[in-house]
Amino acid sequence: MKFRLRFTSEARKKLEELSKQDPKKNKKVLKTLGLMETNLRHPGLKTHKYDSLEGPNGEEVFEAYVENRTPGAFRVFWCYGPNEKEITILAITPHP
C-alpha cells in the first residue's frame, strides 16, 4: 500500500537541518522515508509500535529504523493519519 507522508513542523525542521549539517545522514533518512511511502513492512525498516509515545490525537505511534547498530542511530517516529493512506512523521531523531 502506498502512503502519502505528512510532517509535523518539528520533523520538517529536523529534515532541513540534516540536509545542511549532515548530508550523509540526510540521505539515509530520505531513503527510509521513501521505503515508508511504498512498503511499511520492508524488513530494513524494522517497524514496530512504540509504546512510550502517543500521536497528537492519542494515536498509536510507530518507530522505523534509519540506522541500526550505530551509536546515536536515527529513528523515524510516525502515526497513521489524519486521512486514509496517510502517515504523519512526528519526529526524526537519534534513538532515545
Give the location of each predicted region.
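Basic, Lys/Arg-enriched alpha-helical interface segments
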Residues: 1-73, 80-96
